[in-house]
């Protein structure tokens, strides 16, 4: 099994890809993980690698700092690759952007803290799920780690919301006719007290 982990940070600034890679290695012994930067990604590359799954990491900078040209390849992969794809935090937002849906600052300010002139949802908070897809065999309310101040403002066409809370209406989404999933939270940052994120990742790897 080859996991293609797309690093959405600029110049490696950001912990998301490293944390995802470390957790994947712990969860599945012998798992092969290839990490490449977002600007090197193309549909041709994916067809050549033939990974079993694709994961989109969080990003390190505001989306305004990413040029359309640098994102063109990964956007095409998101729209066309047949493999199961999971977007985490910024990767979730990246899925929305690739289909033309808006991403912006959260309007609801609780719970959160001041962050660069906005409010940031940071810490372990509950979300309500529909218990389908990557939330299969999980309770209808799970507790997962959040660290964001942007959110997907509207669902892309052909998607449905699969998780929400009072702070963020689209905590997770899935494309109706493909195994394409986005989660605004960080399932990889689970611990013994908050194990739900682990099951989310395991469910994805079983697809």
Language model regions located:
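Acyltransferase
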Residues: 12, 185-207
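Glycine-rich nucleotide phosphate-binding loop and flanking beta-alpha elements
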Residues: 12, 61-63, 92, 152-153, ...
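Cofactor-binding loop segments of dinucleotide-utilizing enzymes, especially the Rossmann-like FAD-
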Residues: 6-8, 38, 90
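Flexible gly/pro-rich beta->alpha loop and the following alpha-helix that scaffold active-site loops
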Residues: 21-87, 99
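Glycine-rich, phosphate-binding/catalytic loops in enzymes
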Residues: 20-23, 70-75, 103-105, 162-163, ...
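Flexible loop residues that form catalytic
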Residues: 8-11, 59, 178, 188
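Short, charged N-terminal beta->alpha structural module
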Residues: 3-28
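Pocket-forming structural segment of enzyme catalytic cores
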Residues: 86, 97-195
């Amino acid at each position: 099994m080859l996991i293609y982990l797309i690093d959405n940070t600029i110049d490696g600034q950001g912990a998301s890809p490293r944390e995802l890679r470390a957790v994947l290695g712990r969860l599945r012994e012998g798992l092969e993980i290839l990490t490449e930067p977002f600007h090197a990604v193309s549909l041709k590359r994916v067809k050549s690698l033939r990974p079993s799954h694709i994961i989109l990491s969080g990003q390190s900078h505001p989306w305004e700092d990413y040029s359309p040209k640098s994102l063109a390849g990964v956007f095409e992969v998101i729209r066309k690759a047949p493999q199961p794809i999971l977007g985490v935090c910024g990767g979730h937002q990246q899925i929305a952007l690739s289909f033309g849906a808006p991403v912006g600052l959260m309007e609801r300010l609780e719970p959160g803290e001041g962050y660069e002139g906005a409010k940031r949802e940071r810490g372990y908070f509950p979300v309500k799920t529909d218990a389908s897809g990557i939330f299969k065999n999980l309770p209808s309310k799970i507790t997962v780690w959040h660290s964001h101040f942007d959110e997907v403002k509207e669902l892309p066409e052909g998607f449905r919301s699969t998780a929400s809370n009072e702070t963020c209406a689209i905590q997770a989404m899935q494309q109706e006719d493909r195994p394409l999933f986005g989660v605004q939270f960080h399932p990889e940052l689970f611990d013994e007290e908050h194990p739900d994120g682990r099951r989310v990742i395991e469910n994805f790897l079983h697809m």
